A protein has these predicted regions:
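Short, surface-exposed acidic/glycine-rich loop or hinge patches that mediate macromolecular interfaces
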Residues: 32-33, 61
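Short, low-complexity, polar/charged sequence segments that are solvent-exposed and flexible
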Residues: 16-19, 36-39, 73-77
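Extracytoplasmic juxtamembrane/flexible linker immediately downstream
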Residues: 1-32, 50, 80-89
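Amphipathic alpha-helical interaction surfaces in cytosolic regulatory modules
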Residues: 60-85
Length: 89
């Protein structure tokens, strides 16, 4: 996604980045990950540090269905604040 204004968070802390490529493949960091494994990985990260922030980047060609899969997986892990990452135009 692209935004007119992009803000870099001041508090970096522990962060996980989930990416969805144009084929709908989900990655946690650089590792491909099925939605059920994503839930377990995010749950584990939150148990280790509840302040963990999770960012979602999706290719412009990724479908809404794949974004919903990630949203469901992170919600099932107990995450209540998924941050959508954008690139400034």
């Amino acid at each position: 996604p692209v935004a007119e204004v992009a803000q870099v968070p001041e508090e970096r802390g522990i962060r996980q980045t989930i990416s969805i490529d144009e084929n709908g493949v989900i990655y946690l960091g650089a590792r491909p990950m099925a939605p059920d494994r994503l839930t377990a990985a995010i749950r584990n990260a939150l148990e280790n540090d509840p302040r963990t922030k999770v960012y979602l980047r999706a290719d412009a060609r990724a479908t809404h269905r794949h974004v919903q899969e990630v949203m469901r997986a992170t919600a099932a892990a107990g995450l209540n604040n998924l941050i959508f990452a954008t690139n400034q135009e």
